[in-house]
From Swiss-Prot:
The lineage of its organism: Bacteria, Pseudomonadati, Spirochaetota, Spirochaetia, Spirochaetales. May help load RecA onto ssDNA. Signal peptide: none annotated. This is Protein Smf. Belongs to the DprA/Smf family. It comes from Borreliella burgdorferi (strain ATCC 35210 / DSM 4680 / CIP 102532 / B31). PANTHER family: PROTEIN SMF. One of its GO terms (biological process) is DNA-mediated transformation. InterPro entries: DprA.
């Protein structure tokens, strides 16, 4: 109850919520007024905020229990270290299944909702090769490029992680819910920072993209027009110092081409992908036994962002 009550204090940043969580018990925290909170943090807010409704918090707790969702709190052992890199990391994330393994390489494979059949096939192809070589696939579970990336990992019987904009009991979009059980069976996870009963807002999608980039070591965009949400993910990734890749410039969309103009690297073929991962490419799609260490941080440190990965895996 205390955790959910504090997480409902939407006007506070994640680290401020954590400070309340660590220093107040439930009976005391529910007595705090906005003025008390302002005094505690030595700051004032521009407008009055409605404090959490205890009945709503009780209902949220029941949803968490009914869905058997897990909660990772900022600063806890279960909270992903990579996520701590982002601006204002969430106080709590709610998830089903598992969270990404920090010791493994993870790529965000994202793109537009509206993609051609050919681009959908290319997204699956690249994601499949990443997954079967030990790279965990992170994406936003949206229709289009996102779900194609997830499906590729599922088809390879590998782990993939879906970050959703809605709450854990209202997985969005509905048409992709049929993939949830298989995704979870294979050790993946559904992840969100949205609380039960929160009415979805447009900015929730940007918050979702922020988590996608935060959980990833590199970002690969297969198709993105100029107004694609995938560009937000890429820009956030660049802010974190991540490598950003785009598919063939003849097909990847104007938004992805613009990213290339700002330094994103082009990946045209699966062979290009294997070269980035420092793995020998075999035409039969069979990888030599002595090359299957792409998920080891030390083996990829000279290829992508190994130094950063070493830090967050400590």
């Amino acid at each position: 109850m205390k955790l959910l009550y504090i997480d409902n204090l939407k006007f506070l940043k994640g680290k401020e919520k954590l400070k309340l969580f660590n220093n107040f018990d439930f009976n005391n925290v529910i007595k705090l007024t906005q003025k008390d909170i302002e005094s505690y943090f030595l700051k004032s807010f521009r407008r009055l905020f409605k404090l959490p409704d205890l009945k709503l918090v009780e209902l949220q707790e029941k949803v968490i229990q009914r869905t058997k969702a897990k909660v990772a709190i900022l600063g806890s052992k279960s909270y992903p270290n990579k996520l701590k890199r982002i601006y204002d990391p969430p106080f709590a994330i709610y998830y089903k299944g598992n969270l990404p393994d920090c010791s493994l390489l993870s790529w965000a494979v994202v793109g537009s909702r509206k993609i051609s059949k050919t681009l959908a096939e290319r997204t699956r192809e690249f994601s499949s090769h990443l997954a079967k070589n030990g790279v965990e696939i992170i994406s936003g579970f949206a229709i289009g490029a996102d779900i194609e990336a997830h499906i590729a990992a599922i088809n390879e019987n590998k782990r993939t992680f879906a970050v959703i904009p809605t709450d854990i009991d209202n997985i969005y979009p509905r048409q992709n819910r049929k993939y949830v059980s298989k995704l979870l069976e294979q050790g993946g996870g559904i992840i969100t920072e949205t609380l039960p009963f929160d009415k979805i807002q447009n900015y929730f999608f940007a918050k979702r993209n922020r988590l996608v980039s935060g959980l990833s070591d590199a970002i690969f965009i297969t198709y993105a027009p100029l107004k694609s949400g995938a560009l937000i993910t890429a820009e956030l990734g660049l802010d974190l110092g991540l490598d950003v890749y785009v598919y063939d410039l003849d097909f990847c969309g104007d938004g992805a081409v613009k990213l290339h103009d700002f330094g994103a690297q082009e990946i045209k073929t699966v062979k290009d992908l294997y070269a980035l991962l420092n793995i020998k490419y075999v035409d039969s799609n069979n990888i030599e036994d002595d090359s299957k260490e792409c998920c080891n941080c030390k083996n990829v440190s000279d290829v992508l962002i190994g130094e950063l990965l070493k830090e967050v895996c400590k």
